[in-house]
Amino acid sequence: MTGKKSSREKRRKRSSQEAAAALAAPDIVPALASGSSGSTSGCGSAGGCGSVSCCGNANFSGSVTGGGSGGSCWGGSSVERSERRKRRSTDSSSVSGSLQQETKYILPTLEKELFLAEHSDLEEGGLDLTVSLKPVSFYISDKKEMLQQCFCIIGEKKLQKMLPDVLKNCSIEEIKKLCQEQLELLSEKKILKILEGDNGMDSDMEEEADDGSKMGSDLVSQQDICIDSASSVRENKQPEGLELKQGKGEDSDVLSINADAYDSDIEGPCNEEAAAPEAPENTVQSEAGQIDDLEKDIEKSVNEILGLAESSPNEPKAATLAVPPPEDVQPSAQQLELLELEMRARAIKALMKAGDIKKPA
């Protein structure tokens, strides 16, 4: 009887344990889900279930513990990834910061170099210290060399910036040729003034003023020569003309003969005209006290006129033979004025002829 009771009690205990295990089984499933999500609390409850392995569910409980360990590994990998991301972000930020600092230092230096390259007067090759430096005016006798030195001073880059829009497409050789043509037209004096900084218009005005003063002095000298020659001719030949005017009808022929003689005398060498002494201009003398002198001059002039008429075949002989002996009649004021005008006209005509002869020579 005791044996049967003990077996019954054992069976009851087993059934109660199985019922307790069956009741605990639905609690293990949410524990696995919580363990797979990485929560350590689910893993701990699964570990508690592992203590019930005495009922033969050891394998199941072992799987529960494994799920807990898997959750812990998943959580650790996510932490490592987040740390790696943080490291990458810090590395990228440090690299970008260093690049920004480098650009801050590099860009100003590049800008300075470009600015200096654009605005500097230095050209390729630099300055040759072996060649002695001389001013541009030193080469004024050789205009071609002076132009070459000017182009070396300015340089090709700066010249291209200085050129107007019309000459932008021209080459350096064409520009040099144009400059050479313009330079040949300028005098050395004007080039020196331009190099000294004087205005070109001022130099042109000065040159025109110099030319005008020269022309004015030439005109004044010609007028002086004309006046001197007219006065000398008038003083020397006036008495003869006065007495010839007193003739009856042949006065014009006599005056024409005298005019040819005066022209031949005036057209002589210029040196003789310059060397001729300037006689005082006392052309009008008193009428009463000069009658005897007039008679002598009349006789002399008549003889000269007769000699000229015989020597010139073109003149008619009747003109010289028809001159009557002069009478003692004083010339009128109108005759004197006409004679003076005629003498001046002859002197001007002779000077014009002399100037025409000098020009071809």
Swiss-Prot record:
List where Basic residues composition bias occurs. Answer: 1-14
Residues with PTM Phosphothreonine: 90
Coiled-coil intervals, chain numbering: 281-311
| UniProt keyword Nucleus present | no
On the tree of life, the source organism's domain of life is Eukaryota
Q: Does the keyword Translocase apply?
A: no
| Annotated region (Disordered), positions in chain | 1-28, 67-100, 198-218, 230-331
Signal sequence region: none
Chain intervals with Basic and acidic residues compositional bias = 234-251
An example Gene Ontology biological process: negative regulation of apoptotic process
Entry comment describing in which tissues the protein is expressed: Ubiquitous.
Tell me where in this chain the PTM Phosphoserine is found: 89, 120, 203, 312
**Pfam families, per the entry:** CAAP1
**Which ranges are annotated Low complexity under compositional bias?**
19-28, 272-281
Record's keyword terms, sorted:
Apoptosis, Coiled coil, Isopeptide bond, Phosphoprotein, Ubl conjugation
Q: Where is the composition biased (Acidic residues)?
A: 199-210
Q: List residues of cross-link (Glycyl lysine isopeptide (Lys-Gly) (interchain with G-Cter in SUMO2)).
A: 104
Record's function text? Anti-apoptotic protein that modulates a caspase-10 dependent mitochondrial caspase-3/9 feedback amplification loop.
Q: What is the protein's given name?
A: Caspase activity and apoptosis inhibitor 1
